Structure formats: structure tokens, C-alpha cells
UniProtKB/Swiss-Prot annotation:
This protein's name: Iron-sulfur cluster assembly protein CyaY
Keyword Nucleotide-binding attached: no
Keywords for this protein: Iron, Metal-binding
MF terms (GO), sorted A to Z: ferric iron binding; ferrous iron binding
Organism: Vibrio atlanticus (strain LGP32) (Vibrio splendidus (strain Mel32))
The family this protein is said to belong to: Belongs to the frataxin family.
SMART domains registered for this protein in UniProt: Frataxin_Cyay
Length: 104
């Protein structure tokens, strides 16, 4: 995958995360600055998601630790857990919010 394809695919993931947060009506603020998306919760905890262009990866940092995602079979997959990026984002958001979130 070249640089342009990588950015296009990551942009889609970031957009999906934003839309899911909006549709869930959860109290999660998000901001995208450059290559970094910051999710902030009512308790001021944060999840940081950023693109690592040189390695063609998406990295996620939360209170559970740091995770690296590579595109495997058209799915962003964690190198540690095998979990899909979107599923981990949802799981980590619920941990940070300390409540179940109604994901649509």
C-alpha cells in the first residue's frame, strides 16, 4: 500500500469512529489535529489514536496500554490481541466512560 492509499484508509477509519461516537450520544469529546485523534471523557481520561505513516499502522493509547494495528485482510487488526480496531475503540471507550455505551 502506498502513502496515499494508507491515508485514505485511515481517514475512513477515523470518520467511522467519529460517526459511531456521534450516533451513540455518549459524552465523549473528540478532536482531530493533524494525524492524531483525541477522545476525551467526562472524567478527563483520554484515548489517543494516531496514524504511523512510516510503518503503515494505526496506534491506539489508552489506560489499558498501547496497541498497534496493521491492515490484514482489509481489517485493521491489533498485533497484540488480534482484535479489530473499531471493536477495541468501542471497548476502550466503555472502560474510560465507566459505563456501557449504546453503539448503533
Amino acid at each position: 500500500m502506498n502513502e496515499t492509499e494508507f491515508h485514505k484508509l485511515v481517514d475512513i477509519q477515523m470518520q467511522n469512529i467519529e460517526e459511531a461516537i456521534d450516533e451513540s450520544e455518549a459524552d465523549i469529546d473528540y478532536e482531530v489535529t493533524g494525524n492524531v485523534m483525541t477522545l476525551e471523557f467526562e472524567n478527563r481520561s483520554q484515548i489517543i489514536i494516531n496514524r504511523q505513516e512510516p510503518m503503515r499502522e494505526i496506534w491506539l493509547a489508552s489506560k489499558s496500554g498501547g496497541f498497534h494495528f496493521k491492515l490484514v485482510d482489509d481489517k485493521w487488526t491489533c498485533s497484540k490481541t488480534g482484535m479489530a480496531l473499531f471493536e477495541m475503540v468501542k471497548e476502550e471507550c466503555e472502560k474510560h466512560a465507566d459505563e456501557e455505551i449504546n453503539w448503533v
